[in-house]
Each structure stands twice: as structure tokens, then as C-alpha cells.
């Protein structure tokens, strides 16, 4: 399952090739990949619009089009990459044609990955907590914001409304290393 560092790696690998480009079409092979919008919505709202930024928010790959965003979540087996040629793999959920001739492909063996369309990033920001790689995420912040919680430490670390982007592998590693898995967080 792609965790926050893997998602960041994907963002870094596609950003330079996407910023400044425009989608000209989308080929949807697995309709459920488009979670809260349709292919027609994509064509109406995102085609021929300049991609102004590509960044990560939690485990989402966010493509910005001025105010609108396309947020892509890889889930367990999703992969986002530029195709070298014709795309006909049986696990391809969607492919998007760019005005420079490239194809951005979303491949997902288990079919859990999703695309979300929002008219602003505010929706994601309201739904998700602090970024663990951001400057605001400090030991003081952690103590202050988790001090009075009466939940298991692993559950707190996995709660995306508190800390955005941490996954099971990091929560388990932390609790194992610290031997806190069975302790309540009131130890602060």
C-alpha cells in the first residue's frame, strides 16, 4: 500500500512533466475510479485547463487547475505514471491524454483507487489534519493536541483528521518501538 513517502515520490516524479500542461481527453476503463464526478464532468471542467501545480496532501496526489483540483488517492495498489506507448494493460482504470502527446495512466490491480473532483482544496484541508512533514508538526504540537485524548496511540496516529497521511506501517512501527500500543495517551 502506498504510504505518504511513496505518494510524495510519485508527485515528485510527475510534477515537472504535468505543470503547464492541459488534459485533452480521458479514457475511463473502470467507471468507479471517478468517485464524485463523471467522465462528462471531467471533460467539462478539467479539459483544456492549465495544470498550475502538482502536490501532495496527506496521501492524495493533488493536481491544481487554478481553484479546481483533481485529487487522486492510490489506495492499496494504485500507480500513476506516464505511459511509454499504447496503454492496454488489463488493470488500467483510466488514462488521460495531455496536449503535449503524453499519457498519464492510472493503473490499479485491486480497483480501490479513486479520483475526486473539488472546486477548491478547502474540502481536503477541512477534512484532513496536520501534515507530519510540515514545519508546524512539532513535539509541542503533538503533546498539546493529543494530551487529553482517550484513545489508543495507534488509533490516534491513524486518524487522518488529526495527522494527515500516516498509515498503518508507520503507526505500527511507532507503537512497537515505543511499546505504547496498549497504553492510553493520557501519559503526557
Feature-to-residue mapping (PLM):
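Single conserved hydrophobic/aromatic residue that forms the stacking wall/gate
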Residues: 176, 181-188
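Structured catalytic/nucleic-acid-binding cores of DNA maintenance enzymes
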Residues: 1-178
Amino acid at each position: 500500500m502506498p504510504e505518504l513517502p511513496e505518494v510524495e515520490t510519485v508527485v515528485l516524479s510527475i510534477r515537472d512533466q504535468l505543470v503547464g500542461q492541459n488534459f485533452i481527453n480521458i479514457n475511463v476503463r473502470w467507471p468507479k475510479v471517478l468517485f464524485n464526478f463523471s467522465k462528462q464532468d471531467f471533460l467539462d471542467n478539467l479539459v483544456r485547463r492549465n495544470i498550475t501545480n502538482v502536490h501532495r496532501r496527506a496521501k492524495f496526489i493533488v493536481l491544481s487547475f487554478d481553484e479546481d483540483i483533481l485529487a487522486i488517492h492510490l489506495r492499496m495498489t494504485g500507480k500513476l505514471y506516464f505511459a511509454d506507448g499504447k496503454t492496454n494493460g488489463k488493470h488500467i482504470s483510466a488514462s488521460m491524454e495531455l496536449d503535449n502527446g503524453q499519457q498519464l495512466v492510472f493503473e490499479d490491480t485491486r480497483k480501490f483507487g479513486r479520483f475526486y473532483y473539488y472546486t477548491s482544496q478547502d474540502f481536503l484541508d477541512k477534512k484532513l489534519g496536520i501534515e507530519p512533514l510540515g514545519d508546524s508538526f512539532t513535539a509541542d504540537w503533538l503533546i498539546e493536541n493529543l494530551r487529553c485524548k482517550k484513545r489508543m496511540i495507534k488509533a490516534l496516529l491513524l486518524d487522518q483528521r488529526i495527522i494527515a497521511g500516516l498509515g498503518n506501517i508507520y503507526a505500527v512501527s511507532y507503537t512497537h518501538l515505543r511499546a505504547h500500543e496498549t497504553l492510553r495517551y493520557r501519559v503526557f
